[in-house]
Amino acid sequence: MQGPNVAAMGATGGTQLSFADLAHAQGAAWTPADEMSLRETTFVVVDLETTGGRTTGNDATPPDAITEIGAVKVCGGAVLGEFATLVNPQHSIPPQIVRLTGITTAMVGNAPTIDAVLPMFFEFAGDSVLVAHNAGFDIGFLRAAARRCDITWPQPQVLCTMRLARRVLSRDEAPSVRLAALARLFAVASNPTHRALDDARATVDVLHALIERVGNQGVHTYAELRSYLPNVTQAQRCKRVLAETLPHRPGVYLFRGPSGEVLYVGTAADLRRRVSQYFNGTDRRKRMTEMVMLASSIDHVECAHPLEAGVRELRMLSTHAPPYNRRSKFPYRWWWVALTDEAFPRLSVIRAPRHDRVVGPFRSRSKAAETAALLARCTGLRTCTTRLTRSARHGPACPELEVSACPAARDVTAAQYAEAVLRAAALIGGLDNAALAAAVQQVTELAERRRYESAARLRDHLATAIEALWHGQRLRALAALPELIAAKPDGPREGGYQLAVIRHGQLAAAGRAPRGVPPMPVVDAIRRGAQAILPTPAPLGGALVEEIALIARWLAEPGVRIVGVSNDAAGLASPVRSAGPWAAWAATARSAQLAGEQLSRGWQSDLPTEPHPSREQLFGRTGVDCRTGPPQPLLPGRQPFSTAG
């Protein structure tokens, strides 16, 4: 079922069931429905609207909740009944969800809560086959709600129309299998509207159209339909034996080709279970099917915990660059903004700096160039590229003001220009963030002067710069520590602790203290066997960007505690005047930018004349969203503080 589009915005904390986890969807035990023809099978097509895409939360963020349930019971093409109700999520609905679904917090204020609605829905569904479009989303939310309400999950049969569509339709016929796209393809009578009952009705029509297609291929019972879904070739089934020797442990797996070459590298919390999915049709990616056909063996490395598995995967991807992996194969393809080594330094965008006075990393060169131009304006560094000797003076060779103003002072010596260099170095190193405060103030002033377009562009550039500065400062603080030992509880089921020895931002050793075993002797043992790490002059001491970022995220997870640091270190700390105080401002600015982009992609015609409530807080005041008056002139791309804005 089509879930709210916020799942694409986010949230790395989002969780939904894989198709292998759906209750009895594939490979389930025999039920009476298996022997029934599809015409005799009763389906309950369900759709949910929610406050977001996460079924689980943490100490800081609660899980998202269901706001509406809509369902249609059908059999033999006839509608037997419908179920529809709003659900009180017991917290406010985010503005982007309100804009998407039209369901407001006020609308659900008097609605029943999920603990009252769920038993009624299960009674309505009975022992029918549950159908959903993107079933992992909808069934995942229903199961999570049942668990939180202490309601027994009825273990229904589950059918996903999105997966069925991808199995039945070619990509030429259906490039997208989103519900709206399939509704257009089949010209269904009920159009999806991001309201639960409307979407459920549309899914009923899509289901019937897909069943018509499979009927021509000899699929007439629900059991035959389940067997039809996996789309597994006999050659794939024959290779299941490759996974039989793998342990049920976390680790890294490597698919190898006929000549021993590494085809693909991946990680798993359970090696045997994850690798088996490549042979039962759970993984639907075309390139994975091709890779499995080429594979002749599978190697694996057991790991103490998921952090070690993630780090080992990144290192193996860097070493082998497997052809069937798409990410992390080229760990040095990052862009950095660095101070040049010359008499009149400037900010330059380069791939491989030889020192650590850098801003970044950036995936995009254009973002790095925008940040370099903005920081030059903030600190008074020059943007002209003329090579100046120590005895020269800056200014005569700069372009005229009307063309492209150089932010550095004119007619100054190298000694006088050094003040700007010190300001830039202090900003990069986290010793002085006054320039960021001034830039934020300029955004406010532009908004107060009703120059909203200029303010929005400056806001977006500044948000990118703050995020890059703060990200780099945190990673450099971790890379500067000679040694840090951290522990994370292994969860209530396993017990014990996951242990990591981190040296200069790199994982030097990993281990686990099982439940009932004193952890400190284990810490001492893995510390003695830890790898020696020698930092280099490169950014982050030579650590892989993705590795140190992965470790930093792990350290920030709930429950992680620092066991100890090296004797000569004060601990893991950010610079006193880092970009951190402005990180929340940058996050708000980024949300405003995303909201503006969504509006520009088709919501302008629906805008009310007054400011939209979801955009009133762009700059902390109502009315800043005013769209009256002549358009503002565009800011030059490399001069965010120029006379245009």
From Swiss-Prot:
- Known EC number: 3.1.-.-
Question: MF terms per GO, please?
Answer: DNA binding; DNA-directed DNA polymerase activity; endonuclease activity; exonuclease activity
Protein biosynthesis: is it a keyword of this entry?
Answer: no
Which Gene3D superfamilies does this UniProt record tie to the protein?
GIY-YIG endonuclease, Ribonuclease H-like superfamily/Ribonuclease H
Name of the molecule in the record:
Putative bifunctional exonuclease/endonuclease protein Rv2191
Cite a single GO BP annotation: DNA damage response
Query: Has keyword Flavoprotein?
Result: no
Q: Where is the Exonuclease domain?
A: 44-207
Enzyme kind, highest EC tier: hydrolase
Keyword line: Endonuclease, Exonuclease, Hydrolase, Multifunctional enzyme, Nuclease
Name the SUPFAM superfamilies for this protein. GIY-YIG endonuclease, Ribonuclease H-like
Ranges of Low complexity compositional bias?
A: 635-645
| PROSITE patterns associated with the record | GIY_YIG
Per the record, the domain comment is: Seems to contain an N-terminal exonuclease domain and a C-terminal UvrC-like endonuclease domain.
A GO cellular component annotated for this chain's UniProt record is: peptidoglycan-based cell wall
Q: Tell me the segments the record calls region Disordered.
A: 603-645
Q: Name all GIY-YIG domain ranges.
A: 248-326
Which source organism does the UniProt entry give? Mycobacterium tuberculosis (strain ATCC 25618 / H37Rv)
Q: Pfam families, from UniProt?
A: RNase_T
Coiled-coil region(s) at which residues? Answer: none
